[in-house]
């Protein structure tokens, strides 16, 4: 169960039992929630319509089409009507805070001091929450996504936090295509963020599958990281084992002629528990490259 501002969101693979429904009602009253929603998890999300993927109201009053929630003093625009996601992936909360605070762990900052305003490239940017954190930390951001709708959502997230989106770049396009273009221009970034979906389809580069293509993605991204800059590689595909993810990323970095000089493997948050029936799906690696 997630709490998003004044609303609760319950996610299960199966319909709620009467007992579970009553638990939601009880917790809703205790937390003084205005409403509660239920979302059926579907592993075939690519084949599911937006209406079927969206959460449905099971208690209280309906949320507005768009509403705001606060995380680490930053505001984000959310919705229960936009399909599988609400606009913010809560399992990345800790990593947003690392970026916002410019501290991955003691002695390991995201951005080195004395380099001026850092440049950040956020690929597969979705609603640009990581870009907002980077911008609030003083960076100049470029958000790249294949959806005009979500890029505009990202601009609104900037406005909600009194950040002028006109001071930052928002690029509509294919990540692989734009990485090539940026490399030809000689662009270099202090941080390149990779947080792709498990599957993605583009007219330019075709089908992206994290399990098959992450190494190539990491290699292309590494070419855009300046010396002693950072690569943030994230993957939420349960089909890609942590050991394989690590090997794929490191192979891509090596093929690009780069080396990792410092790294940190972020754990899946405690409120996304790992068990025998629910192995860890989230892989996150912060890496400084030579």
Question: Model regions: which residues?
Answer:
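Conserved SAM-binding motif I beta-strand of class I
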Residues: 140-145
């Amino acid at each position: 169960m997630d709490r998003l501002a004044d609303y609760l969101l319950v996610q299960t693979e199966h319909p709620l039992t009467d007992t579970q429904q009553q638990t939601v009602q009880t917790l809703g009253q205790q937390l003084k929630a205005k409403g509660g929603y239920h979302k059926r998890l579907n592993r075939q999300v690519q084949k599911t319509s937006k209406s079927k993927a969206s959460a449905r109201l099971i208690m209280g009053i309906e949320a507005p089409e768009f509403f705001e929630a606060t995380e680490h003093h930053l505001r984000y625009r959310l919705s229960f009507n936009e399909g599988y996601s609400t606009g913010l992936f809560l399992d990345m909360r800790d990593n947003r805070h690392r970026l916002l605070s410019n501290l991955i762990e003691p002695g390991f900052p995201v951005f080195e001091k004395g380099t001026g305003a850092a440049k950040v490239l956020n690929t597969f940017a979705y609603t640009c929450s990581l870009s907002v954190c980077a911008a609030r930390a003083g960076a100049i951001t470029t958000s790249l996504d294949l959806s005009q709708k979500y890029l505009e959502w990202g601009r609104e997230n900037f406005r909600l936090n009194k950040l002028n989106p006109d001071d930052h770049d928002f690029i509509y396009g294919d990540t692989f295509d734009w990485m090539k273009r940026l490399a030809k221009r000689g662009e270099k970034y202090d941080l390149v963020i990779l947080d792709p979906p498990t599957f993605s389809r583009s007219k330019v580069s075709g089908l992206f599958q994290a399990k098959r293509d992450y190494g190539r993605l990491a290699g292309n991204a590494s070419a855009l990281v300046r010396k002693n800059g950072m690569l943030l590689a994230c993957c939420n595909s349960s089909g890609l084992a942590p050991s394989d993810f690590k090997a794929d990323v490191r192979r891509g970095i090596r093929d690009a002629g780069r080396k990792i000089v410092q790294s940190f493997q972020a754990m899946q948050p405690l409120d996304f528990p790992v068990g025998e029936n629910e192995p860890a799906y989230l892989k996150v690696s912060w890496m400084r490259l030579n």
